[in-house]
């Protein structure tokens, strides 16, 4: 025997089912100076630290800082965006000897509007060792770390974008990029970056003993670094190329330095008041498009001049 069930009953049952469904999905969560890590990380009840918020958000979700404060170091093990609201300074101070941000995940990681302060005791500002990752670092300030400001050492393929970012006053390099495994590729762009006063290293250092790296640097400035403004080094053949346009190196030991089997190309770039403006070492390749400016005209090695087009 069939019993007819009124549609209003079915609708009520369906509504109740939805109402009792688990509400665990968190595509966007929040932190604030007045937050508490026992909160659910909503806008009305934000968390206190970035780490708790990252733990709470879904993979691929977003963590937003509502107001200016220090929100603690982060270990990132999922795809995530970490950003600050407009006008907010979202600070991260690591524990002594630790990193401000450690990235060890596949997928996309996007960091925007963060201020990483090492206080001359933190190790790296941003440390990445993961594989098959896309990383974006935008409008960030990274300073006073004992080692590198940004250390990208992927164990697989990596696509990177570093935009409008400052890496300064660190103990070693401002930005270092080093693929770790044979057959892997690191590709990306550094645009409007400032790397300066890095004490014992280089503003931007791209190096490899195994994988390939193809990096474009545009509209950037590297100055007052202890060793080199922008440097490349490879021991594995022609798989490392850094292309520069509208980029300035100044007041470094060497402005542009290519070593090993690496290659550099220059267009509409400037080297001024470096100990040596351009140094192309044995086996390295330097290509100039003829529209660059060397203030002191000091060039070591051979530059290949290409026709402008």
What is each PLM-predicted segment?
Residues 85-86, 107-118, 133-144, 158-171, ...:
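Right-handed parallel beta-helix
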Residues 1-10:
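Bacterial N-terminal signal peptides that target proteins for export
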Residues 23-27:
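Boundary at the C-terminal end of the N-terminal hydrophobic targeting segment
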Residues 93-102, 120-129, 144-154, 169-185, ...:
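Extracellular beta-strand/beta-solenoid scaffold signature
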Residues 58-59, 70-83, 91-134, 148-155:
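Extracellular beta-strand-rich solenoid/capping regions of secreted or surface-exposed proteins
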């Amino acid at each position: 025997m069939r019993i007819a069930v009124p549609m209003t009953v079915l609708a009520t049952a369906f509504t109740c089912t939805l109402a009792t469904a688990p509400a665990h999905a968190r595509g966007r969560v929040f932190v604030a100076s007045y937050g508490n890590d026992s909160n659910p990380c909503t806008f009305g009840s934000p968390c206190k630290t970035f780490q708790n918020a990252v733990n709470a958000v879904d993979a691929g979700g977003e963590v937003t800082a509502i107001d200016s404060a220090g929100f603690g170091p982060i270990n990132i093990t999922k795809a995530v965006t970490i950003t600050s609201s407009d006008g907010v300074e979202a600070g991260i101070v690591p524990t002594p000897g630790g990193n401000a941000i450690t990235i060890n995940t596949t997928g996309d990681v996007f960091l925007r509007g963060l201020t990483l302060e090492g206080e001359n005791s933190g190790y790296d500002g941003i440390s990445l060792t993961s594989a098959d990752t896309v990383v974006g670092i935008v409008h960030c300030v990274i300073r006073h770390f004992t080692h590198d400001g940004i250390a990208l050492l992927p164990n697989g393929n990596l696509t990177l974008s570093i935009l409008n970012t400052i890496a300064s006053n660190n103990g070693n390099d401002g930005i270092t990029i080093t693929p770790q495994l044979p057959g892997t590729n690191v590709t990306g762009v550094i645009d409007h970056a400032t790397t300066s006063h890095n004490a014992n290293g280089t503003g931007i250092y791209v190096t490899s003993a195994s994988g390939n790296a193809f990096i474009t640097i545009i509209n950037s400035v590297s100055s007052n670094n202890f060793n080199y403004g922008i440097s490349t080094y490879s021991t594995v053949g022609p798989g490392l190329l850094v292309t520069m346009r509208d980029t300035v190196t100044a007041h470094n030991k060497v402005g542009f330095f290519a070593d090993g089997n690496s290659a550099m190309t220059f267009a509409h770039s400037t080297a001024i008041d470096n100990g040596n403006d351009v140094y192309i070492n044995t086996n390295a390749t330097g290509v100039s498009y003829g529209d660059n400016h060397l203030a002191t005209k000091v060039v070591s090695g051979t530059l290949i001049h290409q026709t402008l087009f």
